[in-house]
């Protein structure tokens, strides 16, 4: 669909490319969301084509064992 917007999530606990892949998969599993995760910056930029709540984004990442510091 059309991109509605994007959010940047600051995430701690990612240490390697496996962590990046895990976070990417977790976010991409949300319908309408696509993530670009940077290990170096410790963040995920999430593009979405429907409204996705910060709570939903936070939950899927924290369920994998990472900590979400902020979403904006």
What do the PLM-derived regions correspond to, one by one?
Residues 1-72:
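Flexible metal-binding regulatory segments at protein termini and peripheral loops
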